[in-house]
């Protein structure tokens, strides 16, 4: 709610943040693009009711047309239907992996930032250990070892989803932990925190009421970066054949299937690669805009 100072209404912090975000034209445009993609993958299959696994060899490798706006693959399957279905999975993996990374990283960073001595040192040693590990070989190894047991336990699609989200999120929390720890180390010495501590407020309430809310800006920005990184990681795993099963058309899997037909059916790879490119680019620009909006010192 606007505050009146000296007879002049001052915008609320949320309004000021929105005004700074609107100045970042690429971030605003990227928000519109990402929102359009989310609406398309969420509601598109309800309007475009072509089954994703319908095979029509008479229409194989067709280019874009009225009946198949994105063309078809080598089995004559409609690429628009498969892109809409796969977009749900790719974006869901990105968002879920981001939540895992944010929750784990924020928890570890908060404990390290509030603790002293051996606890802080041990958690930072653990963070440095994970940062030193080569992520891609370990991703491949973990998925190779645990994919089949999880498939048998909860089914091929959900089991693969859980495994990929856990693995990607498990290798993205370290940067968040370091960022949160630095914020906590800075904020815990501020006057308003010292005043609350002097009034007898417990450490848990200090964190939840004062320190964590003032650290949300950098955490949100880190979350947007993690979404983009998770989408790329899932697409990479699917392209290498270690992601979802072949009958589940994620964007990375569609790109993998298109690699042998680049010369005769370039539209196949173009739409899959374009979906990944637009999603990742939009999220990165949104992250830039949020960084400038949430931290006025970085905005020009």
Task: List where the protein language model places each region.
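Short alpha-helical transmembrane interface motifs in multi-pass membrane proteins
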Residues: 89-93, 108, 124, 162-166, ...
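Amphipathic cytosolic juxtamembrane alpha-helices at the membrane-cytosol interface
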Residues: 77-92, 96, 112, 116-124, ...
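Generic hydrophobic transmembrane alpha-helix motif, especially the helices
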Residues: 69, 79, 103-104, 113-114, ...
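Gly/Trp-centered helix-boundary motif
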Residues: 1-106, 110-111, 118, 132, ...
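Helix-loop interface residues and adjacent transmembrane-helix termini in multi-pass membrane transporters
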Residues: 114-118, 158, 224, 239, ...
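Residue-level hotspots within pore-lining transmembrane alpha-helices
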Residues: 88, 130, 134, 171-174, ...
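Hydrophobic alpha-helical interface/terminus motif in multipass membrane transporters
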Residues: 111-112, 142, 146, 180, ...
